[in-house]
Design a protein with these regions (language model features):
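Phosphate-ester processing/binding pockets and catalytic centers
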Residues: 1-257
Length: 257
C-alpha cells in the first residue's frame, strides 16, 4: 500500500494552505507472487543503472536518492517511466484505490471542528481512507500480509485497527469475513512492490490532474476498484469505478484547484 498527495489543508491560523496537492489517494496492489514482482522490477532498475545512456542523469546520482535507489514515477525521467509502464502492463495485479479531494476534505474538517471542536489530524484522515478502502477488498482469501509504505514512523497497530473496522462493518452487513491480516511497514526503497503501487497512483493522478490518459490506459485492466469519495453526482457514497464500469476521463468530475 502507498499514498499519493498529502493531507495538508490549513496553516496554524486555520487558513487554507497554498501549494498543496488537490488530491489525496491511498492505493493497494494485491500481488499473488511478490517475490517475482520484486525480481522483475529490481532487474529492470539494475539494467538502467548499468546502461551508459543514463550516465550523468541527475536522478541516477547516488546523492540524489532517486532512481539510483528506487523507482519512483514522479522522479524518474520519461525514458524510465516508459519502460516501467511497459513492464507493469505485463504483471498481473489487482489494484484498489480510494480518492479524496482536498476541497471537500477542508469542508469536512471545518464542519467537524465547528460542531465538535475536534481538529482532524493527518492520521485520522489516513486511517479513515484505509477503512473505506478495505470495505471493497475480499476478506475470504485466507491469511495475508498488508505492507504499508512508511513515510515517517510505522503505525502498524493503528492501521490494523482501521482494517479491522472495515471487517467489522462488513460482518455487520452479513458479509463473510475469514481473512486474518498481518500489517507491516517498509520504506519504498526496500520493496519494489511498493514502487509498483506508486506507479499506479501516479498514473491515476495524471489522469485526474493533467487529463492524461496514456498512462492509465497501460494499466487500467488491473484496477479492480477506484472509489472517488467526493464525486457524489450519481451516488451518495461516491463514484465507484470497477471492471464493469472502468474509469475514463469523460466520467471524472473535474478537480478544483
Amino acid at each position: 500500500m502507498d499514498e499519493s498527495g498529502d493531507t495538508d489543508m490549513f496553516d496554524k491560523k486555520g487558513r487554507p494552505l497554498p501549494n498543496v496537492s488537490n488530491l489525496f489517494m491511498i492505493g493497494l496492489a494485491i500481488i499473488d507472487d511478490p517475490e517475482d514482482v520484486r525480481a522483475k522490477l529490481d532487474n529492470l532498475r539494475n539494467q538502467f543503472l548499468a546502461d551508459p545512456y543514463f550516465t550523468g542523469v541527475p536522478s541516477f546520482q547516488d546523492d540524489a536518492k532517486k532512481t539510483a535507489i528506487m523507482l519512483h514515477a514522479k522522479d524518474d525521467i520519461p525514458e524510465i517511466r516508459w519502460k516501467v509502464f511497459d513492464l507493469l502492463s505485463t504483471i498481473p495485479v489487482k489494484v484498489a484505490v480510494v480518492i479524496r479531494r482536498k476541497e471537500d476534505m477542508r469542508r469536512d474538517a471545518q464542519s467537524i471542528f465547528q460542531s465538535t471542536g475536534q481538529k482532524i489530524t493527518d492520521n485520522i484522515i489516513y486511517d479513515n481512507v484505509v477503512t473505506m478502502l478495505f470495505r471493497y477488498i475480499s476478506h475470504t482469501k485466507g491469511d495475508c500480509e498488508i505492507k504499508f509504505a512508511v513515510k515517517k514512523k510505522p503505525r502498524n497497530a493503528a492501521l490494523l485497527a482501521a482494517i479491522n473496522s472495515s471487517q467489522a462493518s462488513l460482518k455487520s452487513k452479513g458479509n463473510r469475513v475469514t481473512t486474518r491480516i498481518k500489517v507491516s511497514s517498509e520504506h519504498s526503497r526496500n520493496d519494489a512492490c511498493l514502487q509498483l503501487t506508486d506507479y499506479y497512483l501516479w498514473a491515476l493522478n495524471r489522469l485526474y490532474i493533467n487529463q492524461e490518459t496514456r498512462y492509465i490506459d497501460k494499466l487500467k485492466d488491473n484496477f479492480n476498484v477506484i472509489l472517488d469519495v467526493d464525486d457524489i453526482r450519481n451516488m451518495k457514497g461516491g463514484e465507484l469505478f470497477t471492471r464493469h464500469n472502468p474509469i475514463e476521463l469523460i466520467k471524472i468530475m473535474p478537480v478544483s484547484s
